[in-house]
Amino acid sequence: MAEAAMAKSIEIPDCCYPKEPVLVRPSSSKPRHTLYLSNLDDQKFLRFSIKYLYVYKRSVGVEALTTSLSKVLVEYHPLAGRLRPVGEDGEKCQVDCNGEGALLAEAYVDLTAEEFLQGCGRPNRSWRKLLYRVEAQSFLDVPPLVVQQVTHLSCGGMILCTAINHCLSDAIGTAQFLHAWALLAAKPDANLPVNAFHDRCILKPRVPPEIAFSHPEFSSPPAQDSHSGDLFQFLLSQPLVPVSLTFTPSQILHLKKQSVPSIKCTSFEVLASHVWRAWIKSLDPPASLRIKLLFSMNVRGRLKPELPGGYYGNGFVLACAETSVEELVTSNAHHGIKLVQEAKKRVTGEYVRSMIDLLEERRVKPDLSSSLVISSWTKLGLEELDFGGGRPLHMGPLASEIYCVFLPVTGDLHAFTMIMSVPHEIADRFQQYCRRGLDDDDDDDDDTEKGGSG
């Protein structure tokens, strides 16, 4: 397992902006209208931007990027609009498709691609210099497509940072948009392979609502004793450090073999279970504490009828696996994998409809008190984004957060990179638990281990 958790992180010098950022408008206008956001789009915990960072060996001219962005915004016109509150309480949002444009900044920095790559496994706060800061009084003041910043490097390469509002799309949607933009930058006369479908009315709640399931991803567990605390609040109170680990195909296969009895499972299922278990063991909460794993699931094909091809809204929900600390850490890999599989199986079309109806109440939010959240950016082709100067040398998030992201590995379709931030005091321990069971010399020995401090 390659690791970059404690590698030296690169400090980004200040960027030089030769001119003011520009608002790039769609190259042809559409009639102004408002776009309904579904309850899956308009959850308060999604009111942030998905931020990607790309490093390229060769720069692409900013004129080509601007022209292609203007073209692609015709197909993805809501991204050139603005969020607006709806109703007297302003709790719900919609998109004012007014064509005001997406922000594009150009910058220069005294840094080479090689220098950046030496420390790219450990994001830090200085990386935020690579994304132009939009001053705003509130979330609603920020454009749905907040900013694209092209930063030219001293070696002739470039770093491209993008920030796309999560209320407009999920990871699948952002990848769809970025691939379309890259295609038009590299081949201006190309036809887009996928047409964006923006209408969210197919996901409107039922009248009256039919909440037919308990939805543990939103409900909090029964009150715990004061000793147990709140894992989420504990994490927020701690100095955090990013941990980045890459799992090779052979290591993932070896993890699958740790399940007794054996179980047919995907790479995501075994890695999600493995990382969850390592995270809990390193935090060492009370053995009786009820814990959850929340992970994003694409439901485009699970609804009846299915969402149309090219659907450009949030088409995911959080699936929920739940157990106790003691059950998770004293069982072998089979237990955690089975929990993940059962959580996936519960997410049927009716389950999603029930969740949409539940969200109409506007009072529920994901239960993060004792949960690890995992989002997978693999299998989206994000590592293949070519704007005309070649594929990226590096692709990843702009920042590391307390939730976990699975990333693709350039050149190896079957490997995964995991990145997340953990308290500094447990970072080494977390890595040690992640390494267990990856090869014959370091098989997991959890049958003799009694995790949990309570």
Residues of each region from the PLM?
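Non-catalytic N-terminal regions of enzymes
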Residues: M1-Q224, F232-S296, R300-Y311, G315-F316, ...
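Catalytic core of tubulin tyrosine ligase-like
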Residues: G336, M355
